[in-house]
Amino acid sequence: GTYLYGLCGEGSLILAGLVDHLCTQQKLKGAGFVVVVPSGNEQAALLQDKGFQWAFPLRCLPREVDRNLWSQAEFDTVTAKKLCELRARFWPDTVQLPPEQMAVVLGDLYSSGATLVSNDNGYGIYFRKEDTLYFVEMMATGDRAAEILMEAAREKEVIVEKAVITVGAAQNLFLGEGTRQDYGMIRFEGEPFDVSESYMRLMLD
């Protein structure tokens, strides 16, 4: 597949023509699908006219984080290779960039103060702002495993009491909770396939 980003043009007609050209070229190169994260509603509407459909929705949910000295996890910087391995382990049906491009995404995250928390049952990437942890990605074997990661992060950061977590809408964490958010779109250049339980996040957007 192919990922489009940084789409811009002087007027919708020029941008529409650019999208058509790019998709045609990628199909000739063997791409079975093209994905994109639209910059806004106007661009999303244009992309829908060009055969793209919404996919990869997210859920954003706030949670109180209990204090628990027994919750253990490791804190480290994660390499692009390691993140791809973690995603393959906890959610194989993930659309993601190759490690070389993921390294750029991770570099931006860590220069902005992101921290990785992980153990054998999951991992999360978060920022701290005042008394709240903002998890931009979290994958774990279940709700309790995710709570342990948050509790360990609370002990490290000391002053936090709350967390805001962004997960894939179909993820098995805290099902039924949170506000659904649109994220990515997909256009099939070959035979369509089911992406209702697929995940895409932390792209070059």
Give the role of each language-model region.
Residues G6-K29, V36, G142-E155:
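Conserved acetyl-CoA-binding loop-helix of GNAT-fold acetyltransferases
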Residues G1, G32-V35:
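Beta-sheet entry/capping signal
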Residues V37-A73, V136-D143, E147-D205:
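Active-site/acyl-donor-binding loops of N-acyltransferases
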